[in-house]
């Protein structure tokens, strides 16, 4: 999971 990649979040910004």
UniProtKB/Swiss-Prot annotation:
Record's keyword annotation contains ATP-binding: no
Tissue: Follicle, fully grown oocyte and egg(EC2).
UniProt entry keywords in alphabetical sequence: Pheromone, Secreted
GO cellular component term, pick one: extracellular region
Subcellular location: Secreted
An MF annotation (GO) of this entry: pheromone activity
Entry annotated with the keyword Phosphoprotein: no
Role description: Has myotropic activity targeting the genital tract.
Record's protein name: Pheromone peptide ILME
Organism listed in the record: Sepia officinalis (Common cuttlefish)
